Amino acid sequence: MKKTFAAVALVLATAGVAAQNYEPSPDLEALHVPLDGLLELHVRDGLVYYRALQGDRGRLNQYIAALNAPAVVSAYPKWSDNQKKAFWLNAYNALVLQTVVRHYPIQGGAKAYPSNSVRQIPGAFEKTPHGIAGKQLTLDQIENTVLAEFNDPRVYIALGRGAVGSGRLRSEAFSGKAVDKQLDQVKAQFAVTPRWVKIEPLSGRVSISPILSWRAQAFIGEYADDSFDLPKREPIERAVIGFLRPHLLAAEEEFIKKNTFQLAYEPFDWRLNDLTGGRPD
């Protein structure tokens, strides 16, 4: 994929093709090669070198423009569900990167969020429309409407919301051929990383990211029946345990089965997931 990306970049640079005139291949795997290269170069451990990406924004903008090209719009209905799922995950994550880069460095005054938060950008998620696959959609519409149709709650922890509290942004694009495996990896990593999940037998607590509560019905529908037998627990509590169950250590499983734990949602960390100048504390 690295060689392919380099070849594509060389051809485009040599031809001097403007982003709006670039007609991409309608094949999904080839379409996402540029994003794959950008993520590999600028993302580490879910954090982004935004200053460096800002200098590379031409390629990012060109990739996003390609997602709404006529060839893509006409080919989209022929893609499989997995190809469409990968497409929208990549589109969302790329659009968040573009949004941050356009306003970087972020310095906002809204007291409800950190000064460098993507939430300091007015309307970033709920108001700004983006042309993707022939539609005009906000980021919230992509998440709440388009991605919701796949009935796969793993997608919500695969979204890079431009925040430290988001699921870990991968250093590769999602692929239609591999998206199910990639999402399994996202889930497994999420379930064992203290940033998102803490199982503490000594304090009797299971602390988890609020992302699962934001999308409670989706997680309940997929994971509640996978829980241990936990009488008198709410559906979302059973769903959380069903979600975590395949990834529990023996001691953690023993603690959960006692059914004495308290489930708590940690505050979402809206600090920018920026690696420029060092990791966030």
Each PLM stretch: what is its role?
Residues N21-D281:
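Interaction/scaffold regions that mediate signaling and macromolecular assembly across diverse proteins
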